[in-house]
């Protein structure tokens, strides 16, 4: 993460602990325990899509493509003045995120809002966005390909 500009060395009084969580495939997922930080963080109440609205939008389509914006949160920079709050401790030292990490209480709302802005005119008409997953849908193959192109061009 250091070499990709996701984290940087830090000296921060906010440092949280790292937790390694075992995934279904046996590999480990790097997580930071932000419970203390989250307990004092302003909660962003931006709404996530409702399932019945999603099902209604998809109901007339026959073609579907799913896109997973893997590491999508890492495309949202953290303000320099807030980076120390994202700090964590490892055996190699203290680091802080330069981009939005998973685990922050407001991260899902921030990301959903961004995706809704980026795909605003396509949402519920050509695609559905739920956090870092996008479903592009269409009634016919040509329509589906056109809609995929529209999503990719954003």
What are these regions (language model features)?
Residues 1-154:
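Retroelement reverse transcriptase polymerase core
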